[in-house]
Amino acid sequence: MFIDGKWILREDLDILNPYTLEIIERITALDREETKYAIEVATENKDVMKELNPSKRYSLLMKIAEHISSKKDLFANTISVDVGKPIKQSRIEVDRTITAFRLSALYAKELRGETIPSENEIIFTKKEPVGVVGAITPFNFPLNLITHKIGPAIATGNAVVLHPSSKAPITAIYLTKVIEHVLKKMNIERGVFNLTTGNGEIVGDEIAKNEKINFLSFTGSVEVGELISKSSYMKKVALELGGNNPLIVLKDSDIELAAKSAVKSKFLNSGQVCISVGKVIVEEEVLETFTKKVIEETKKLVLGNPLDEKTDLGPLITPESALRVEILIKESISEGGELLIGGNRSNSLISPAVLNIDEDNILSKVEAFGPILPILKAKDDEHALNIANNSKYGLQAGIFTNDINKAMKFANKLEYGGVIVNGSPTFRKDNMPFGGIKKSGLGKEGIKYAVEEMCETKTVVIHNM
């Protein structure tokens, strides 16, 4: 809907407030031909970005960060209305976004090749942009996850085609207005950045398949990620997908700290986080104590209006999502799971649920993407390790222990892209490498690592000089 520096404004798609279920905006839904046009515009302008020197890319990114910083309250409120995230969590997302743009700016000046030793030739490498980056983003972090794609893309001199989730595109529209303003002030062709709103089956599908997209960065479900992987036509891809992330609690750990961490990280954004705790695996000697503390902490949580400062959990993104979670809880119970607290649904709201399950239960196998905290018993640390690794996913894992030898054992043997010791798998810093193995994804995010992914290395050999 923002293509070649122009806004395409229609009322094709109703966007609902997840909490009130009222229409907050009617936006443009691009068709396939319009999406192709956006990609063509980015292709025509990729040399504009390539020719921007690192200092100008740095300035561009820093100015975007400055403008967001000057509109913190606007962006935080927009996130909360857009996706139902509690306002105190939305403010954290805005701060992280500012940091991510500033990190991207710093790495714009850090693109370096190397010199290759040779007796008779001069051989060196140089970093060049891939050309056009397609960014497909989910609803759950509608500002920061966009930044993790477009920040490195701009830093490396690429043109961008952004497609935000059709469930929550309003934050992306506000961000695009900031980028439009900065590009205009810096006299940079606005066709270097294009926003494509609409249905993923059309817009996202075209971005994934179009051969003029040189690099595709996607965050979303495993099912869609697998389809993209099969249809990406040899383009470079980074897929940040889902998981069932284990949190392991050994008997020698600080049980109170582990319980508080499990509850806080599981119910962040109502469990709609790709690195949310999928299950807690607890050594049986401390299972009762841990479970009791988890229930105590869960009872303290406030469910309600995301704009209320007291709210800890807001709604899920749609009533259908809440219904899916409710059905998943019932399925778990039918398989022998014991519901200890919560699980009550009203429209898009669902109260935080804690269940006791065994390792064959559905909640031990799937990504719930909702406020469900399953707890499993392990006979010993080896059993806990086996349960954790018995998964098709491999995004992040957490382990609580006060034994450094056990910490290192789990760090080495857990089959996950990241292992967090004495913390939950939900931990993430914007400058650390982030990405899973197995069905949880391909490639790495994190500003520095995304910058590396969005470059090509060119080798230059000079003879007879």
Curated annotation (Swiss-Prot):
Pathway: Cofactor biosynthesis; coenzyme F420 biosynthesis
Matching InterPro entries: Ald_DH/histidinol_DH, Ald_DH_C, Ald_DH_CS_GLU, Ald_DH_N, Aldehyde_DH_dom, ALDH-related_metabolic_enz, Lactaldehyde_DH
Top EC category: oxidoreductase
Active-site residues from the entry: E240, C274
Catalytic activities: (S)-lactaldehyde + NAD(+) + H2O = (S)-lactate + NADH + 2 H(+)
Residues that hold NAD(+) according to the record: G220, S221, V222, E223, V224, G225
The entry's keywords: NAD, Oxidoreductase
Matching SUPFAM superfamilies: ALDH-like
A Pfam family assignment: Aldedh
Domain of life, source organism: Archaea
GO molecular function, a single term: lactaldehyde dehydrogenase (NAD+) activity
E.C. number: 1.2.1.22
Free-text function comment from the UniProt entry: Involved in F420 biosynthesis through the oxidation of lactaldehyde to lactate.
Subunit relationships: Homotetramer.
Matching NCBIfam families: lactal_redase_Meth
Family membership: Belongs to the aldehyde dehydrogenase family.
Name of the protein in its database record: Lactaldehyde dehydrogenase
Organism listed in the record: Methanococcus vannielii (strain ATCC 35089 / DSM 1224 / JCM 13029 / OCM 148 / SB)
